[in-house]
């Protein structure tokens, strides 16, 4: 992916992680997990459940993620874009 382009999945997951939003994760098998996203990478999520247990979930097993409240993931995208523009201005 080109530098400066937006990755919606990462913006969304990072905002959920930073705000510690409770989520319901629906797996392809029909199973549901409820908890807070503690971290993620290209292939996995780490979710902490209500009983303080952590689970590593592979993204290919996820159908959808439903936050308990609306997420403003575009605010982070705009902040990233502004920081990138300032960095470019300082270099030139």
From Swiss-Prot:
UniProt keyword annotations, A-Z: RNA-binding, Stress response
GO cellular component, one term: cytosol
Pfam family, one: Hfq
Known partners and oligomeric status: Homohexamer.
Disordered: region residues: 73-92
Protein name per the record: RNA-binding protein Hfq
Gene3D superfamilies, per the entry: 2.30.30.100
Similarity-based family: Belongs to the Hfq family.
Calcium listed as a keyword: no
An example Gene Ontology biological process: regulation of RNA stability
């Amino acid at each position: 992916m080109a530098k400066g382009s937006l990755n919606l999945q990462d913006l969304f997951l990072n905002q959920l992680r930073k705000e510690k939003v409770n989520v319901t994760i629906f797996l392809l098998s029909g199973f549901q997990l409820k908890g807070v996203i503690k971290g993620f990478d290209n292939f996995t999520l780490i979710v902490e459940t209500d009983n303080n247990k952590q689970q590593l979930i592979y993204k290919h097993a996820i159908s959808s993620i439903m936050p308990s409240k609306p997420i403003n993931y575009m605010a982070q995208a705009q902040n990233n874009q502004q920081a990138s523009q300032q960095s470019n201005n300082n270099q030139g």
